[in-house]
Amino acid sequence: MHEKLTTRFAPSPTGYLHIGGLRTALYNYLYARKNGGNFLLRIEDTDLKRNSKEATKAIIEAFKWCGLEHDGEVTYQSERFDLYKEYVKKLLDEGKAYYCYMSKEELEELRAKQEAAKERPRYDGRYREFTGTPPQGIEPVVRIKAPQSGEIVFEDGVKGEVRFKAEDIMDDFIIARSDGTPTYNFTVVIDDALMGVSDVIRGDDHLSNTPKQIVLYEALGFKIPKFFHVAMIHGEDGKKLSKRHGATDVMEYKEMGILPQALLNFLVRLGWSHGDDEVFSLEDLKKLFDPYHINKSASCYNAKKLEWLNAHYIKTLPFEEINRQLKDLGFDLSVYEKAGFLLDLLRERAKTLHDIINGAKSIVNAPQNYDENAVQKFVNENNLELLQAFANTLKDQKTGKDFEDFTNDFLEKKEAKLKDLAQPIRIALTGSAVSPSIFEVLEFLGVDECKKRIDNFLKVRGK
């Protein structure tokens, strides 16, 4: 029977969801969807001191915002401690793991000797075959009997064949601490196996964990999944992406007015490509994405590319989707008359949703003040008179074309040019010298409102 391809995303809720984490989640999601498989979400919250309910909530909110739907219920490792203990006991009973009674002092002494001899710090296996009376006052840890020689080899979907010499990278590592809590590598293996995870796509910072996990899969008799280790995202300076490069929290991008469609499109291209194509919808990606085509080398974050993609999606997504995202930012475009026309007015120049919000407010609301720099630059006695004459002559124009034809005729009669009038009109109508096409703004506002705003501006200028 052919097993169902199953991937997972398994964040630790000790902080916000980083965009590198979102890219990992996206790769796992797309691979599962392409193959009709399952995409699971597991919260690795065994570190009870550092866990945060707010962080867990933020991870789930980020998934919802991005439209990455996981299958089944969320799995919480903190609810599975009894299960992990069962498997620790199983390995102890089978002689594949053992109690280690090494004291803190013994461990420090061993490390000091190894350091002095310029050896790699490692546990020396002194309790591996211990059968004597356990020393008093020591709460033991549990260690796995790891291979002491030979190679651990696996075929990575991104990096190709990966080899580790057991003696170079491994000692009998701890699977349960002295307080009984399981370690990271142990819980990951138990959960991936029992959840039926067949393919693991994760950052290559986990590469060094893989040989240890393979040792555990083999000791427990579980099938080893296929691994794909993806290179990190770097900043534009070539260093590992961090807060100094800009936003890294997924939900910060939402607050910045970035659309989830743009962010996902941007992230999938940081490490994967399909020909020279730049723009991919989520539906496209579900058909096209292949983790075997992920680049081996690190990708560089490019803020300009994200801005370009965001502008593209603002231009092309339907009104309902743009307004749904605007509502999440506390702004509802649909309350305005001619809302669709207003969006079309603004979307051609907008780079973020805040450009839509600010642009809509500047057009819909009569200006309470005027950009003084723009006034100084573009307004003078001559064009104030021209503006007054323009307002007085406006009559029954309705469409942008009506206003354009009227303006051209008016300027011809006055022997003036559009540059003499366009900026004063913009400033009078919106308070700023930056706006969409003045003819479309005139159409949106209508003759009466335009006259009212121009008259108000002229009064402020002493006319």
Swiss-Prot record:
GO cellular component terms, A-Z: cytosol
CDD domains the UniProt entry points to: GluRS_core (cd00808)
Compartments where located: Cytoplasm
Keyword annotations of the record: Aminoacyl-tRNA synthetase, ATP-binding, Cytoplasm, Ligase, Nucleotide-binding, Protein biosynthesis
Gene Ontology MF: a single term: glutamate-tRNA ligase activity
Residue numbers covered by motif 'HIGH' region: 11-21
GO biological process: glutamyl-tRNA aminoacylation
Keyword DNA repair: no
Chain positions of motif 'KMSKS' region: 240-244
PROSITE patterns: AA_TRNA_LIGASE_I
Binding site for ATP: K243
EC numbers, comma separated: 6.1.1.17
Reactions this protein catalyses: tRNA(Glu) + L-glutamate + ATP = L-glutamyl-tRNA(Glu) + AMP + diphosphate
Gene3D superfamilies cross-referenced by the UniProt entry: 1.10.10.350, HUPs
UniProt key word DNA damage: no
Catalytic EC class: ligase
UniProt function note: Catalyzes the attachment of glutamate to tRNA(Glu) in a two-step reaction: glutamate is first activated by ATP to form Glu-AMP and then transferred to the acceptor end of tRNA(Glu).
HAMAP family membership: Glu_tRNA_synth_type1
Family: Belongs to the class-I aminoacyl-tRNA synthetase family. Glutamate--tRNA ligase type 1 subfamily.
Quaternary data: Monomer.
UniProt name for this protein: Glutamate--tRNA ligase 2
Species of the source: Campylobacter jejuni subsp. jejuni serotype O:23/36 (strain 81-176)
High-level lineage: Bacteria, Pseudomonadati, Campylobacterota, Epsilonproteobacteria, Campylobacterales
